[in-house]
């Protein structure tokens, strides 16, 4: 990390609780060190259009955003991508598989905030290195012809890697945030807004409408300059049902209630994890199958599903004493350090079931 900027000359009333400012490379410089190739950029654009077409009802496939709750080990993430890529190709007629590659984690109170914030998992907060690692992982996944999906949490970090992203999400804790609605209005890919943590759907409905409109707000240019950002609005926004403290909302009745609110041609995504499964990876398998039943039964409203999946099922605690950098034996390879995930073998079976459900829906529509 760069040396902190001194605060000695700051006005006596300013920055009383700021310890230091650590400079970041500009987005332009970081991207130039690891750019997309023209072929990769073209693939990202096509993936974005495919996803937009599915949510618009112009493509009858199902978007499946699947991958780890969070990326903490780049090597394991790429191993997972190598398992997923052939499946994405084989099931492409029925599913648009997008790898979930999340680097930023919102915390209810405190905790590890993701690979960008603390890439070494040891509270050294080497954010410049985290940005470099994140960009490399994304490009490595894109190079496997896999679209990537990310949650956008920090309002300035997308400038460093959003060019690689085919689909984005605004999480349950930030859907009501004006900052994130404005951010979504300028993003170049389709964006999903989750319902609130309490299960409130209206905040996501409002967020979609807000993001569809132009905005002016404070932001950072590609050169790193503080700027007024003017956006055109993002017409490719949709709702993600993730359940809440009020209970799950992945069932057919909940989907129908949202359709009534949005209009008969509404299309949405369902998160099979989080409050829809109680963060239980075993229950998540059942939720995926319940959603597949809706699809095979003819529901056109379900255009996407999100699944938390990794090489090894379950989750482990992020114990600093286990880290090799601290002399420990190391974490379990390929297992989540945040929410519990479905293992890769079970995931493969579920993807085949979802593809079959799409084929049944397609046949019934003829």
Curated annotation (Swiss-Prot):
GO terms for biological process: amino acid biosynthetic process; aromatic amino acid family biosynthetic process; chorismate biosynthetic process. Its EC number is 2.5.1.54. It catalyses: D-erythrose 4-phosphate + phosphoenolpyruvate + H2O = 7-phospho-2-dehydro-3-deoxy-D-arabino-heptonate + phosphate. One of its GO terms (cellular component) is cytoplasm. One of its GO terms (molecular function) is 3-deoxy-7-phosphoheptulonate synthase activity. Belongs to the class-I DAHP synthase family. Keywords: Amino-acid biosynthesis, Aromatic amino acid biosynthesis, Transferase. This is Phospho-2-dehydro-3-deoxyheptonate aldolase. Stereospecific condensation of phosphoenolpyruvate (PEP) and D-erythrose-4-phosphate (E4P) giving rise to 3-deoxy-D-arabino-heptulosonate-7-phosphate (DAHP). It comes from the Bacteria. InterPro entries: Aldolase_TIM, DAHP1/KDSA, DAHP_synth_1. Pfam families: DAHP_synth_1. The keyword Amino-acid biosynthesis applies. Pathway: Metabolic intermediate biosynthesis; chorismate biosynthesis; chorismate from D-erythrose 4-phosphate and phosphoenolpyruvate: step 1/7. SUPFAM superfamilies: Aldolase (SSF51569).
């Amino acid at each position: 990390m760069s040396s902190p900027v001194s605060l000695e000359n700051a006005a006596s009333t300013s920055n009383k609780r700021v310890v230091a400012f650590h400079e970041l490379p500009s987005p332009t410089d970081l991207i130039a060190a690891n750019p997309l190739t023209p072929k990769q950029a073209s693939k990202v654009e096509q993936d974005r259009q495919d996803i937009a077409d599915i949510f618009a009802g112009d493509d009858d496939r199902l978007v499946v955003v699947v991958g780890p709750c969070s990326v903490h080990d780049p090597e394991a993430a790429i191993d997972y991508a190598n398992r997923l890529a052939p499946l994405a190709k084989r099931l492409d007629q029925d599913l648009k598989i997008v790898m979930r590659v999340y680097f930023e984690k919102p915390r209810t109170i405190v905790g590890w905030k993701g690979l960008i914030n603390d890439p070494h998992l040891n509270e050294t907060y080497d954010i410049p290195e985290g940005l470099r690692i994140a960009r490399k992982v994304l490009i490595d996944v894109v190079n496997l012809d896999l679209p990537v999906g990310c949650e956008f949490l920090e309002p300035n970090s997308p400038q460093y890697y959003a060019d690689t992203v085919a689909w984005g999400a605004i999480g349950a804790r930030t859907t009501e945030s004006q900052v994130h609605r404005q951010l979504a209005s300028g993003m170049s890919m389709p964006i999903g807004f989750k319902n609130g943590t309490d299960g409130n759907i209206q905040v996501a409905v409002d967020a979609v409408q807000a993001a569809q409109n132009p905005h002016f707000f404070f932001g950072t240019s590609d050169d790193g300059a503080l700027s007024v950002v003017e956006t055109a609005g993002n017409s490719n926004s949709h709702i993600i049902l993730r359940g809440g403290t009020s209970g799950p909302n992945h069932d057919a009745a909940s989907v129908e209630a949202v359709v009534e609110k949005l209009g008969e041609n509404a299309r949405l995504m369902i998160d099979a994890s989080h409050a829809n499964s109680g963060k239980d990876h075993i229950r998540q398998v059942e939720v995926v199958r319940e959603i597949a039943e809706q699809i095979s039964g003819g529901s056109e409203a379900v255009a996407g599903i999100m699944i938390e999946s990794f090489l090894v099922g379950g989750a482990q605690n992020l114990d600093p004493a286990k880290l090799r950098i601290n002399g420990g034996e190391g974490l379990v390879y390929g297992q989540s350090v945040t929410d519990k995930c479905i293992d890769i073998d079970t995931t493969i079976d579920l993807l085949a079931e979802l593809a079959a459900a799409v084929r049944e829906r397609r046949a019934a529509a003829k």
